[in-house]
From Swiss-Prot:
The species this protein was found in: Pyricularia oryzae (strain 70-15 / ATCC MYA-4617 / FGSC 8958)
Keywords, comma-separated and alphabetical: Lyase, Quinate metabolism
Full protein name: Catabolic 3-dehydroquinase
Gene: qutE
Pfam families: DHquinase_II
Family of the protein in this entry: Belongs to the type-II 3-dehydroquinase family.
EC number of the protein: 4.2.1.10
Annotated substrate binding sites: 80, 86, 93, 107-108, 117
Amino acid sequence: MPSQKPTILLLNGPNLNLLGTREPQIYGSTTLSDVQERCLALASSLDVELRHVQSNHEGALVDAIHALRRDLPLAGVVINPGAFTHTSVAIRDALLGVGAPFVELHVSNVHAREAFRHHSYLSDKAVAVICGMGVDGYAVAVEFMAKRLKAQAAAKL
């Protein structure tokens, strides 16, 4: 049964568990735990439910996306797919198969980095793409998705 509140699934892909310690000159020193706490507080203030999943395993992310079906139509995804951005047809297909709107998020500006990072299997289907804002991009993405889901709910009344 769908939740009464809009639900945002915050997904973080491979190596994001190392946020704050891995290449801090690129990704900063804020940890994923800090990001999650900030996003949970923001979601609460916006009166939306937020669930967080981080995995280094593609199938676990696909399973989390599939589980979101129970919250449709008031559900959306904020995803930092990490390296799966450039390789995962499975995550793309899961997002499209579930049909929830999603925001693609990257801490760094992937377009200012190596050429292989310039291609995304998700961007053409995302409702928004945020990159290069550091961890501040998470709050922007959560707020955007919350507003979108609330507007969608209001339109159905």
